[in-house]
UniProtKB/Swiss-Prot annotation:
Keywords of this entry: S-adenosyl-L-methionine, Transferase
The protein's name in its UniProt record: D-histidine 2-aminobutanoyltransferase
Induction of synthesis: Up-regulated in metal-poor media.
Range of residues in the leader sequence: none
UniProt GO molecular function: nicotianamine synthase activity
PANTHER family: NICOTIANAMINE SYNTHASE 3
Amino acid sequence: MNNFNNEIKLILQQYLEKFEAHYERVLQDDQYIEALETLMDDYSEFILNPIYEQQFNAWRDVEEKAQLIKSLQYITAQCVKQVEVIRARRLLDGQASTTGYFDNIEHCIDEEFGQCSITSNDKLLLVGSGAYPMTLIQVAKETGASVIGIDIDPQAVDLGRRIVNVLAPNEDITITDQKVSELKDIKDVTHIIFSSTIPLKYSILEELYDLTNENVVVAMRFGDGIKAIFNYPSQETAEDKWQCVNKHMRPQQIFDIALYKKAAIKVGITDV
């Protein structure tokens, strides 16, 4: 067992060092983006490998494990952010690129809400829309719904707006740096998606309880277990506020989805 522990620890340390090095390079020169995208794709395959998942779960050094997870969560979130920025710039310059990691995310959108599907009469809020807001664009184009994206990064907001102007100029899409408490039409929001790389997503969810209507549905992207090295994990919620009505565990996808409704709304899993 110690050999397995040492192996998984070594692999994760190597990934951490690679991500840190690639991130510094790509900040200096966009040409290194392909190497970072390749690393992200390889990392995704590693996470979805059942053998490594077993080794990760068997690793019992809690403190050492937790520290590595925290470091990997942070650096991979920064890498995703930077890749989105460069992809946005390239698209605006007339170039296009794709990676397995981003394909994985974009192909997951149809699964977000199960039977609580989005229609043209709905309004979606995406918390953490990023510089390359394909979720917003895909939802708006496929459903006709009104969509709002919020992000605390001014660069992401600027690039996101420009991407929307190019790819979906006729859709009802708003991107802003406002906080959830500052959104004037927050009561009209019917569906909410949280990006998986937001560390404070459960604090924002708690804040949303008093701001939103009684029937709002929340899709929380998360990663537990080995998936936590590329996502922030799920957390318990106050039983009298948000009720997790379904956890959609997806062995072949890089993150899973937890569906929440307000505790006052009694909904069974079969209704989701």
